[in-house]
């Protein structure tokens, strides 16, 4: 670890599982790759730090026997010491951060999920293993920690989340950043002169405005919820990134690098230190020198090309920070108990079917424009969204591509969180194709799917859902935009697909089992009834599903749910139910619906010799039912 040595540390999926790997470049010559984590753990989230000229420590989160734990391993000279578990046996631990100071002060922090909350904890590694100390409040959702060890002291920063309501059925999260300093009496939060511990409110470009009138926002291709700490001769800085324009384009993003100095352990007013790019990162070491510091940020160009720039930022050259107050949101605790419903079941012949609730079109931060850690949103879906089934369908290519690493990592978390008969997180992704509306245009023309979208192209997306064994990611631009090649691979892997959005072209393939009628973005069947009824009138036999399509951290609470009747909560039973259309779509309410024709359950095909059909409906709403409408071939024929 002298000036001639460079170590690169990463996580990788290997045949035996996920491992932490490392490779040394000595005097410009790359050495052999070494495995740092053991085979008994599925290891992710690596970080590393140079402790001295001859010592390096690596930390990661490892899964063993359904538990995520933080482990470290140190390299002393040329000898690797045995791995050591640092987190306790309570909860599941993620995202380690390390900080070392030449005086020997060596700390490790991480976030940990237990009792339905994330919290940030840490321990001193200077002389063995010090006691684990609470850093963030225990009754809030606190995660994504970072750590800085300076002459002014040891500081930790983190993201804090509060569930909020913006009106009936409108659920989101309120994001704030916080900083704490280690003192002789433990960890103490830094405040401003008025005693306010909120260092930053992350509202602009992240959460919709509710009052005085609703103003939505869109995606962003940077790290708008990640705190960064920067050392200064006078104190430290807390930095974060925000979307410059609340309503700005996802495809042409612009971001601000915002900073708030901490002087004499007090928060100073925020300022804007850089503008015009996205995905800001601090160079190592994160240190101001002569009033300047180095950062890295990117531009995003059509076709998914990112170009990163080295920025020399000056803390004395800044512009005022301005941000409107976000009114209309109020705190809540999820799940809202009075909104939960008892498990319903129905009898069909000799079989009993349970009613399970699914959101099968969700996103996390593995999608280029979305928010939320994969582990965090699986917990959210299970514990706050009260889902039985969730599928995170990250886009194969939306502005920038989904890498193979990101796809495999998403599937890893799906399998890590699945507990048959308790909770299912199924692997999959979103086929994000756009096809031309001009007959003479080629399917494979990149202009179909790159901004500003040529050939009057329109979305032809699919939710691709695999069984737990998974399947390949077939990126539409790599197969000439040919959905037949997608269908072939999905069928071979035992998966299914569902249409998405209010524009698509049905493929007619057996793996395409359902249509997304509504989502958090709108009621598609109401917007374009001719599309959906036209498919049915032409003999299409597709299930009705509703999926949140949440890019904003709320799986299960994004305005759309699918009720599925299955014999048990297993992947096999759920996929079979979808193939047989034993399901129904709602706008997010958990209404109980049992519809039958001549005694046959919804989704079944029946024949009748006389042409007479007896329809029965049993329904229980979460609110009093106002109206029921019978529709035949796209026309309303009866209202009850």
Question: Over which residues does each language-model region extend?
Answer:
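Extracellular, repeat-based ectodomains that mediate carbohydrate processing or recognition
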Residues: 1-342, 457
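Extended, charged catalytic domains and RNA/DNA-binding interfaces, predominantly
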Residues: 270-277, 291-640
């Amino acid at each position: 670890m002298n000036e001639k040595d460079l170590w690169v540390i990463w996580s990788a999926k290997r045949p035996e599982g996920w491992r932490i790997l490392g490779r040394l470049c000595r005097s410009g010559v790359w050495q052999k790759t070494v495995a740092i984590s053991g085979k008994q753990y599925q290891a992710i989230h690596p970080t590393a730090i140079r402790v001295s000229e001859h010592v390096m420590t690596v930390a990661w989160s490892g899964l063993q026997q359904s538990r995520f734990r933080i482990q470290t391993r140190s390299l002393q000279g040329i000898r690797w010491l045995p791995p050591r578990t640092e987190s306790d046996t309570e909860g599941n631990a993620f995202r380690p951060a390390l900080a070392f100071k030449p005086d020997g002060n060596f700390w490790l922090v991480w976030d940990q999920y237990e009792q339905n909350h994330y919290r940030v904890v840490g321990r001193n590694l200077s002389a063995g293993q010090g006691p684990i100390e609470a850093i963030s409040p225990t009754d809030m959702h606190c995660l994504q920690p970072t750590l800085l060890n300076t002459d002014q002291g040891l500081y930790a920063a983190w993201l804090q989340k509060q569930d909020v309501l913006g009106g009936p059925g409108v659920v989101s999260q309120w994001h704030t950043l916080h900083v704490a300093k280690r003192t002789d009496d433990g960890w103490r939060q830094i405040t401003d002169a008025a005693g306010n511990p909120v260092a930053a409110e992350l509202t602009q470009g992240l959460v919709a405005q509710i009052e005085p009138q609703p103003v939505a926002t869109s995606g962003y291709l940077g790290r708008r919820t990640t705190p960064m700490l920067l050392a200064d001769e006078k104190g430290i800085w807390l930095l974060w990134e925000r979307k410059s324009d609340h309503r700005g384009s996802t495809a042409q993003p612009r971001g601000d690098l915002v900073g708030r100095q901490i002087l004499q352990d007090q928060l100073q007013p925020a300022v804007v230190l850089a503008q015009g790019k996205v995905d800001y990162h601090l160079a190592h070491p994160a240190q101001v020198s002569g009033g300047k510091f180095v950062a890295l940020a990117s531009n995003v160009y059509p076709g998914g090309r990112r170009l990163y720039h080295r920025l020399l930022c000056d803390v004395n050259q800044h512009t005022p920070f301005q941000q409107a107050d976000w009114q209309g949101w109020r705190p809540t605790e999820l799940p809202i108990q009075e909104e939960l419903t008892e498990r319903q079941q129905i009898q069909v012949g000799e079989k009993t079917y349970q009613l399970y609730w699914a959101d099968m079109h969700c996103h996390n931060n593995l999608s280029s424009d979305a928010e939320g850690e994969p582990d965090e949103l699986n917990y959210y879906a299970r514990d706050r969204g009260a889902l039985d089934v969730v599928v995170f369908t990250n886009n194969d290519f939306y502005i920038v591509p989904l890498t193979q690493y990101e796809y495999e990592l998403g599937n890893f978390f799906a399998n890590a969180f699945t507990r048959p008969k308790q909770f299912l997180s199924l692997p999959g992704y979103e086929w994000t194709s756009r096809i031309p509306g001009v007959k003479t245009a080629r399917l494979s023309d990149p202009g179909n799917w790159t901004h500003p979208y040529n050939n009057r192209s329109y979305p032809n997306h699919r939710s691709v859902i695999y069984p737990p064994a998974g399947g390949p990611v077939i990126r539409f631009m790599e197969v000439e935009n040919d959905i037949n090649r997608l269908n072939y691979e999905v069928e071979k892997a035992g998966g299914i697909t569902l249409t998405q959005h209010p524009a698509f072209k049905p493929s007619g393939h057996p793996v395409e089992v359902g249509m997304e009628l509504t989502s958090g973005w709108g009621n598609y069947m109401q917007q374009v009834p001719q599309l959906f009824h036209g498919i049915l009138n032409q003999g299409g036999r597709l299930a009705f599903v509703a999926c949140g399509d949440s890019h904003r951290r709320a799986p299960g609470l994004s305005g759309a749910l699918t009720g599925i009747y299955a014999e048990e909560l297993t992947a096999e039973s759920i996929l079979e139910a979808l193939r047989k259309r034993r399901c129904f779509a709602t706008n997010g309410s958990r209404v109980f619906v049992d519809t039958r024709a001549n005694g046959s359950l919804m989704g079944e095909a029946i024949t009748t010799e006389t042409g007479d059909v007896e329809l029965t409906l049993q329904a229980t709403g979460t609110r009093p039912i106002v109206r029921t409408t019978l529709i035949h071939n796209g026309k309303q024929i009866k209202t009850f």
